[in-house]
Amino acid sequence: MQFKRVKRNIDGVLLLDKPLGISSNQALQMVKRLYQAAKAGHTGSLDPLASGLLPICLGEATKFSHFLLDADKSYRALVTLGSTTTTGDVEGEIMTQAPVTVTQSELEAILQDMVGDILQVPPMYSALKHEGKALYAYAREGVEIPRKPRPVTIHAIALERFDGKQFEMVVSCSKGTYIRTLAEDIGSRLGCGAHLGGLRRLTTAHFNLKNAVTIEQLDQMSQAERDAVLLQVDAAIEDFPIVTLDADSAFYLLQGQEVWKSGLSISGLFRLYSEQGAFLGLGEQTSRGSIAPRRLLRQAGE
């Protein structure tokens, strides 16, 4: 007889250091199994070729995962000059080759030219959908789908190392930026072609790798130790302003009603807490000046 594993209603944010060789969804399922979590979601895909920071939201934290999905991110990228590939990275077949005569000053100038608001054509080897089918599925069939350029922002690029054939750069960018495409565009600007040799995500929003754990480390922990490395649900939105409500206001807000707080003037979303410091959820000030609930925790209202 087979028994179903009991799922846990566990809430929090895990900072995972995803290894090479597995997809973000595979990493998510491993974490979900280790925590026996009833609900989990990641906050922005990393290709199997890429390693690094993958925040995973468990339980009620999934209500706020889209804020991390939309957040700025930074990466360390290894770029190989002198060749292009079918996938834009080291896993593809070489399409073109050219001699590399680039100097470091020329490379640095091109990198700085890429900083700012730019347009990127998404790669065919991506999870973007066309008529319900992922672009990479078309690419594997040899079908090229026209893609419209998308606006992204490159906040900064720092050249870390250059040996004449390869270079490492740290890129800070907006959501939706494809580092593979950035590498290809740099190679095109240099006139020699380029492809991505390796990629590691360093930050997502205000999170970094300092307190991230690996799947192997999680696997060796007891359940209590695993639970202890989880961040609180509100960690995903800690950049939002804080508003504290008295007991009566908190009660009515958790019933879905608008409440009032004198002297409040905040634009946009803010975090709501009880006088005891319990996180209630997100609220927003209406045009009338009242506080309207926007996203509340399940436990807070129970």
Curated annotation (Swiss-Prot):
GO molecular function: RNA binding; tRNA pseudouridine(55) synthase activity
UniProt xrefs under CDD domains: PseudoU_synth_EcTruB (cd02573), PUA_TruB_bacterial (cd21152)
Cited SUPFAM superfamilies: Pseudouridine synthase (SSF55120), PUA domain-like (SSF88697)
Alphabetized Pfam families for the sequence: TruB-C_2 (PF09157), TruB_C_2 (PF16198), TruB_N (PF01509)
Recorded catalytic activity of this chain's protein: uridine(55) in tRNA = pseudouridine(55) in tRNA
Sequence similarity: Belongs to the pseudouridine synthase TruB family. Type 1 subfamily.
Active-site positions on this chain: D47
Keywords tagged on the record: Isomerase, tRNA processing
Enzyme Commission no: 5.4.99.25
Protein name: tRNA pseudouridine synthase B
Example GO BP: mRNA pseudouridine synthesis
Domain of life: Bacteria
Function: Responsible for synthesis of pseudouridine from uracil-55 in the psi GC loop of transfer RNAs.
